[in-house]
Amino acid sequence: MPDVAFATSGSTGPPVTWLRTEAQLQSEAALVREAVLGPARFGRVVSYAPPEHLYGRLYSRELPRVEGVPVTGLWDRPLALPPLDDGVPTLLVCLPATWQLLARHLPALARHGRVTALHSTGPTTPAAHRVTSHLAGTGFRAFELLGSTETGAVAHRPVAAGQHDALPWTLLPDVEVPHDVEPPPGAATDGDPADGHGAARRLRITSPRLARREGAEAPPDDWELPDLVTPVGPRTFHHLGRASRLIKVNGLRCDLARVEELARARCPGVDLVCAPVGDPVRGEHYEMFYVGPRPADPADLRRMLGRLPSGLPAPRAVHRVARIPRSATGKVLTAELTAARHPAEEPEHV
């Protein structure tokens, strides 16, 4: 059978096509079924992930085929509630935005008691942790996958309430980290090595499921993901964030995901994102983009933000835009966003 093509999201550059064999797809679905989801049986899969992307194809097509169960595809109806009235053991294939929907239907999920959620394509959201916290003890389970179009799933961990970031990731059984990989020059972070932040490195792995780039004769021997990690054990690690989300502003380390989390808490109802940009004085910086009728003036949004805690630098500029471009799986198309930006709409905050 011909290989199956999947394109990267184009979130940081032009999309690239990667090819996978049917055997690789079937192997990954079976592996995640056994190593992550465990022995529990499912009577139905409800998927919010579009099958033209790898994550959606694996768990909207391949896994149901392995299980021999029907699929309810809701990727074109992201606000549709999954069927929960019949008590059928259900696997929910979630995108980051799905958890807001689930958070509005906690009583139905609690009554059902036989729902498992699978999460990927982006970090878990505050809504995901609210859902798992509220449903603790009801039989609801949730798991998170880390991976990419190039590698497939690499590692997994439960989605938990509370100190979620403290939970280490575990490599999938067929994934290895080359022992000769050392942190590249400048990869170490500013933290104390004792707290797990002293030996950060990009995650490089080998796996029989690595995809083949279109035009290449074979898959690469290994692949380096844009994720910064610190080892915990031989097959576990802490995830510090994506390298593209961790910047240094005049020597001060800044996690853009953390800035977004704080900004959304202070500006409820505002759709906003941060994008890294080059800076002629500081080397690199970031700018904030938001959508919505309010506040009408970007300077008002900066005032709503106030002073960011923990020494996080304020955005270099704030832009109000007509829309935030996203891929079908919800990833922000950063290159498209920053290419269309206008000159700073309010004075730089130093």
Where are these regions (language model features)?
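Conserved pre-ATP/AMP-binding loop-to-beta segment of ANL
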Residues: 1-7, 40-43
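Conserved AMP-binding A3 loop
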Residues: 3-30
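Conserved AMP-binding loop of ANL adenylate-forming enzymes
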Residues: 34-71
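ATP-dependent adenylate-forming carboxylate-activation enzymes
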Residues: 68-88, 98, 254-259
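Gly/Ser/Thr-rich phosphate-binding loop
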Residues: 104-164
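Conserved ATP-binding loop and adjacent catalytic segment of the adenylate-forming AMP-binding
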Residues: 138-182, 190-201, 211-221
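AMP-binding/adenylate-forming catalytic core of the ANL superfamily
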Residues: 220-313, 330, 336
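Flexible lysine-rich "adenylation lid" loop at the C-terminal edge of ANL adenylation domains
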Residues: 321-342, 350
